[in-house]
C-alpha cells in the first residue's frame, strides 16, 4: 500500500505547463438324541432273574453240599426234554471251597428238568423280542389275557436247539429281570444256596453277560417291559421304605436296585447334595410294568467278578470265597473294553441289543449337576466312575472349590482397574469408560475426586474431568473472555470463538474469510480496511480500491494527488489523459489540462497581459 505523494515540477526541455503523471500499483491484502422308551400293553411271560454265573449247569448232583439254583415250576413230563447241545462250554475245574449260596426252594429237581425250564424260558423270551422288533414301537399292541401261563414248548416234543438272540455290540447290557414279592425283614430272609463250583480267573474288564435265565416257583408272575438301551449316566437306587439291606463288601450300606414301572431315582455323582437330572422322555403309563401291590422288592445280587454287569475291580471275583449271606447292590452297566470280547458260554454279540428291565448304561461323562438334598449322607453313596474312589472324589471337589474361590468365574471378572491396578470382580463393582475398566470408587475426577459413575464427564488424554473442572482448563476467548467449549479459532496468537472473530467495522464473522489487522491490532475485513485506509481520489473523493476480482490497486499520482484511472481527465475538455505525447497532462495554475487546453489558456492570458501594457 502506498500513500499519495506529490512530485515537484521538473525543469526540462518540455513546454512550460506540461506535468508528467505517475501510475502506481498497490498490492491488496489479503469422518453356539432323543431316547424313546416304548411300553407295550401288559403281557405276562415267564419270570426271569438276572444272570448269575455262580453255578455250573453241567454239575451233576450227588456230592455233599452240592445244591443247585432254584428249580423251575414243575412240568408234566420233564424227562422228555433233553438238554440243548452246544450251549455251554465245558465246566471249569471244581473248587469245593469257592463260595456257597443258600437255596430258597430246596425241591428235588433233576438237572434235565432245570435245563428244560431254561430252554423254555429262552424260547419264550426270543419270541417276545421277535414280536417287539417286528412291530412298530409307536403302535399299541392289543391287550392279552393277564393270566397267561408260562410259555413253554410241549412236554412231548424234545427241545434240540434254541433260537439265538441277536444282541448289539453297543451298548453291551446284561439281561436283568426282577420279581415282586412282599418285603421281609433281613433276619427272616433266607438266601438261596448254590452248589459250589470251580474257580475261574477274574476278568480284568467288563464284558457282555449271556442271556442265562432261571425261574422260581415261589414268586408271582409279572409283566415284561422292554426298553431300547441308550447310553446315559448311571442310575442308582435311592433309599425308600420297605427295602432290605444286607452286609456288603464296601464300606457303606449297599442299596439294592428297586423294581418298578418307572425309572429309579437318579444317583449322586459327586456327593449327597447333587443328583443327575435325567433327560425328559415319555413317562411310563399307569398299568405297565409290575402290578404287584405288595411294595417294592429288592432282589439280592450275589457277588461276582467284574466281567458281569460292569462291576468295579474292588468286588469279589468270580469263584473267590464269599460269605453265604452276602447281598450286593446292583451296579450300573458299563461298556466292554474291547469290541468283540466274548466270555465262555455267551451268545455271539452283534447287531442292535435290547434288554429286559435294564437301567440305562453309564456314559463316559455325566450332564451338569443340580443341587438336591433328597439323600442323607450315609444312605446315598455317590455313584462315581470306576476309576475314582469316594475319597478321591471328595478331594477333587475340595480342590475345585478352593480354586473357584481364589479364581472367580470369568462372568464376574471384568478386568484390571486402570486407576488402582486391582482386579474388578463382581457385578456392580466396576464401570467402563474410555475403553478402560475402573472400580466405581476409582472412577473420579482427576482434579476434585468427585465420583463420575452415571455423570457426564470429559476425557482429555485418558483422564476424566467433571464438567466444572474441565471448563476451568479451557482457553478463554480474547473478545468475550469466556471459556471456549467448542471449536477454537486462533488468529494473531490469540484464541477466539468462531462467532466472536468479526470485523470491527461491519461486525461480520471472519471465520473462513480473509482479514487484515491495522496498526492498532484491530481486525478488519479487506473491504472495510480499504475503505478506511486506502487513498482517496482527488476528483471523486472515493477510496482507490482494487477492481472486482483483482488483488492489486491501480491509481494515478499527479501533482501529488491520487486519481482513479477513469478520473484522470482534462478539466476543460474532459478528455482522458494518459502518458502519450498528445494525451499527457499539462497542468496550469493547479488545473489538470491537456496540451490543447493548456495552450488555449496560455494565449488568453498572454493577450490580456498585452492589453494591460
From Swiss-Prot:
The keyword Repeat applies. SUPFAM superfamilies: Glucocorticoid receptor-like (DNA-binding domain). CDD domains: LIM1_TRIP6. InterPro entries: Znf_LIM. Gene3D superfamilies: Cysteine Rich Protein. Residues 1-119, 133-259 are annotated as: Disordered. The keyword Phosphoprotein applies. Its main location: nucleus. Pfam families: LIM. One of its GO terms (biological process) is cell adhesion. Residues 415-474, 475-535, 536-604 form the LIM zinc-binding domain. Residues 26-40, 210-231 have a biased composition (Polar residues). There is a cross-link at residue 328 (Glycyl lysine isopeptide (Lys-Gly) (interchain with G-Cter in SUMO1)). The modification Phosphotyrosine is found at residues 245, 302. PROSITE patterns: LIM_DOMAIN_1, LIM_DOMAIN_2. The modification Omega-N-methylarginine is found at residue 250. It is found in: Nucleus; Cytoplasm; Cell junction. The modification N6-acetyllysine is found at residue 109. SMART domains: LIM (SM00132). One of its GO terms (molecular function) is metal ion binding. Residues 68-94, 184-194 have a biased composition (Pro residues). Belongs to the zyxin/ajuba family. May play a structural role at sites of cell adhesion in maintaining cell shape and motility. In addition to these structural functions, it may also be implicated in signaling events and activation of gene transcription. May be involved in signal transduction from cell adhesion sites to the nucleus allowing successful integration of signals arising from soluble factors and cell-cell adhesion sites. Also suggested to serve as a scaffold protein upon which distinct protein complexes are assembled in the cytoplasm and in the nucleus. Interacts with VASP, with PDZ domains of SCRIB and with ACTN1/alpha-actinin. This is Lipoma-preferred partner homolog. The gene is Lpp.
Amino acid at each position: 500500500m502506498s500513500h499519495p505523494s506529490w512530485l515537484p515540477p521538473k525543469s526540462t526541455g518540455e513546454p512550460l505547463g506540461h506535468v508528467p503523471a505517475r501510475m502506481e500499483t498497490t498490492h491488496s491484502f489479503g469422518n453356539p438324541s432323543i431316547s424313546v422308551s416304548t411300553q407295550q400293553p401288559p403281557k405276562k411271560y415267564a419270570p426271569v432273574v438276572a444272570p448269575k454265573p455262580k453255578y455250573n449247569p453241567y454239575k451233576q448232583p450227588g456230592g455233599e453240599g452240592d445244591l443247585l439254583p432254584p428249580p423251575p415250576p414243575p412240568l408234566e413230563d420233564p424227562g422228555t426234554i433233553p438238554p440243548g447241545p452246544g450251549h455251554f462250554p465245558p465246566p471249569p475245574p471244581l473248587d469245593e471251597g469257592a463260595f456257597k449260596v443258600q437255596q430258597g426252594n430246596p425241591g428235588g429237581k433233576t438237572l434235565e428238568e432245570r435245563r428244560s425250564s431254561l430252554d423254555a424260558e429262552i424260547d419264550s423270551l426270543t419270541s417276545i423280542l421277535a414280536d417287539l422288533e417286528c412291530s412298530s414301537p409307536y403302535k399299541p399292541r392289543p391287550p392279552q389275557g393277564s393270566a397267561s401261563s408260562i410259555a413253554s414248548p410241549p412236554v412231548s416234543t424234545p427241545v434240540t436247539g434254541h433260537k439265538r438272540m441277536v444282541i448289539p455290540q453297543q451298548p453291551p447290557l446284561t439281561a436283568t429281570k426282577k420279581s415282586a414279592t412282599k418285603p421281609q425283614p433281613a433276619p427272616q430272609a433266607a438266601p438261596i444256596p448254590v452248589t459250589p463250583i470251580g474257580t475261574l480267573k477274574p476278568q480284568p474288564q467288563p464284558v457282555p453277560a449271556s442271556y442265562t435265565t432261571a425261574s422260581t416257583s415261589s414268586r408271582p408272575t409279572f409283566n415284561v417291559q422292554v426298553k431300547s438301551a441308550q447310553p446315559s449316566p448311571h442310575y442308582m437306587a435311592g433309599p425308600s421304605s420297605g427295602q432290605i439291606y444286607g452286609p456288603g463288601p464296601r464300606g457303606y450300606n449297599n442299596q439294592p436296585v428297586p423294581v418298578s414301572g418307572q425309572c429309579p431315582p437318579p444317583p449322586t455323582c459327586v456327593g449327597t447334595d447333587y443328583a443327575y437330572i435325567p433327560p425328559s422322555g415319555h413317562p411310563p403309563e399307569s398299568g405297565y410294568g409290575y402290578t404287584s401291590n405288595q411294595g417294592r422288592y429288592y432282589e439280592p445280587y450275589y457277588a461276582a467278578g467284574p466281567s458281569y454287569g460292569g462291576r468295579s475291580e474292588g468286588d469279589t471275583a468270580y469263584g473267590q470265597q464269599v460269605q453265604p449271606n452276602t447281598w450286593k447292590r446292583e451296579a450300573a452297566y458299563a461298556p466292554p473294553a474291547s469290541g468283540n470280547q466274548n466270555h465262555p458260554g455267551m451268545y455271539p454279540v452283534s447287531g442292535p441289543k435290547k434288554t429286559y428291565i435294564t437301567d440305562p448304561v453309564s456314559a463316559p461323562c455325566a450332564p451338569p449337576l443340580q443341587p438336591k438334598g433328597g439323600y442323607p449322607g450315609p444312605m446315598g453313596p455317590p455313584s462315581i466312575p470306576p476309576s475314582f474312589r469316594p475319597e478321591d472324589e471328595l478331594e477333587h471337589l475340595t480342590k475345585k472349590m478352593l480354586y473357584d474361590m481364589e479364581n472367580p468365574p470369568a462372568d464376574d471378572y471384568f478386568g484390571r482397574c486402570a486407576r488402582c491396578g486391582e482386579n474388578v470382580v463382581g457385578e456392580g463393582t466396576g464401570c467402563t469408560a474410555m475403553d478402560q475398566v475402573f472400580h466405581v470408587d476409582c472412577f473420579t475426577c482427576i482434579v476434585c475426586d468427585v465420583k463420575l459413575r452415571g455423570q457426564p464427564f470429559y476425557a482429555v488424554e485418558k483422564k476424566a474431568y467433571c464438567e466444572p473442572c474441565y471448563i476451568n482448563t479451557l482457553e478463554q476467548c480474547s473478545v468475550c473472555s469466556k471459556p471456549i467449549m467448542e471449536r477454537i479459532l486462533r488468529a494473531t496468537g490469540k484464541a477466539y470463538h468462531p462467532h466472536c472473530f468479526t470485523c470491527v467495522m461491519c461486525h461480520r464473522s471472519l471465520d473462513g474469510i480473509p482479514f487484515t489487522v491495522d496498526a492498532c491490532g484491530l481486525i478488519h475485513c479487506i473491504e472495510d480496511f480499504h475503505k478506511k485506509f486506502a487513498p482517496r481520489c482527488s476528483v471523486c473523493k472515493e477510496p482507490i480500491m482494487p477492481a472486482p476480482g483483482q488483488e492489486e490497486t491501480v491509481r494515478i499520482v499527479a501533482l501529488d494527488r491520487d486519481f482513479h484511472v477513469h478520473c484522470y481527465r482534462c478539466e476543460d475538455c474532459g478528455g482522458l489523459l494518459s502518458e502519450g505525447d498528445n494525451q499527457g497532462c499539462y497542468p496550469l495554475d493547479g488545473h489538470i489540462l491537456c496540451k490543447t487546453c493548456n495552450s488555449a489558456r496560455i494565449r488568453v492570458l498572454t493577450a490580456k497581459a498585452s492589453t494591460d501594457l
